[in-house]
Amino acid sequence: MGKWEINDYSEAVKWLKTKSFIDSTKIGITGGSYGGYVTCMALTLGADYFTHGLAEYSVTDWGLYDNVYTERYMDLPAENKEGYKFGSAMTHAKDYKGLLRITHGTLDDNVHMQNTLQLIDKFTSMNKHFELMLYPNERHGVGFPKWVHAQTEYVRFWYKNFLGKDFVNE
């Protein structure tokens, strides 16, 4: 997983960059769960195309995810070592540039927080800048009332990085 998704998104970004109204220094992507995985891969494997990402409760290594789901698409790890390696954001972390904000609930029982911890460990070992927001006692997604904070910070991220403005929270 990861190869064709990033190929498709990168081709779309190449096309967008041909448009005069596109600022190629501000190409963002966001998603949660599998979308968070794609976001992490876009800022690593696709780092030449994407400048900003907001990844929520993301799979970063398919070896850490539910084997019933993963093996349906990737076969057994022993039968597809290269696929599992290529599909891990950790494999491409060396190519990371831009700005990635990672969010995760500490009680996520779907995509375990170990995914986030391994990626940020890799980034910090390489002295890469990123942003991290953890939500204590939240699961796979942030529920109310913390959802209000999560959404406010989500909007603040885009205001600051794409509009160069502070988001006024009233």
Regions flagged by a language model, labelled:
Residues 1-170:
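Active-site-proximal cap/loop segments of hydrolase catalytic domains
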